[in-house]
């Protein structure tokens, strides 16, 4: 696929991929056919001429907040969750490189034997060389979600927009899986997301995005080719902005 990059509204984007998206219909781990599809969708966007960076979650392997609820120390549980994001980042890297996408994994928790440490200037240099940077390890701090990491990295990398790939095709006023009459928003303000406590993203992440005027677009990763459509203002999605 070819495109005039100057015609695209968003030329540099950060894609947030949840750990759950990588496990497909499984209850745990990875579904490689699903990961290959996601990698193919990413390649389609790269072929448009868009610079893509990625933040991955770790919920398909470990959720720190859930472990804390059953008595585990929250900080320790969150660190284990950060390790899960590194596993996911390395998995996604390998699948993407099988499609000839040049990729680097940078972790907020240094693991010199398996990936590079996160250094902002190094990440930007990789992007200048047309490599896809996958950010792992969350923010490197406990009590912070990978949603917060995605917002921070998008701002640090001067991305035009953050796209969150989820299991639903946008933001609803209630859970569409439980309420068939749930209302979907095409656009919604940061303030309304926070005021109505819409559980589409961590509220701290929404607040930082609002302060830095970073638009967020929520879409479904299940639909083949939807990433490229959403980049071009097509397909199904919800945009969160002022």
Curated annotation (Swiss-Prot):
Gene Ontology process terms (BP): 'de novo' CTP biosynthetic process; UDP biosynthetic process
Pfam families: AA_kinase
First-listed, main subcellular location of the protein, grouped into a coarse class: cytoplasm
Gene: pyrH
UniProt GO cellular component terms: cytoplasm
Keywords of this entry: ATP-binding, Cytoplasm, Kinase, Nucleotide-binding, Pyrimidine biosynthesis, Transferase
Upper taxonomic lineage: Bacteria, Pseudomonadati, Pseudomonadota, Alphaproteobacteria, Rickettsiales
EC number(s) stated in the UniProt entry for this protein: 2.7.4.22
InterPro entries (alphabetical): AceGlu_kinase-like_sf, Asp/Glu/Uridylate_kinase, Uridylate_kinase, Uridylate_kinase_bac
Organism: Rickettsia canadensis (strain McKiel)
Name of the protein this chain belongs to: Uridylate kinase
Activity regulation note: Inhibited by UTP.
Entry's localization field: Cytoplasm
Binding site for ATP: 16-19, 59, 63, 166-167, 172, 175
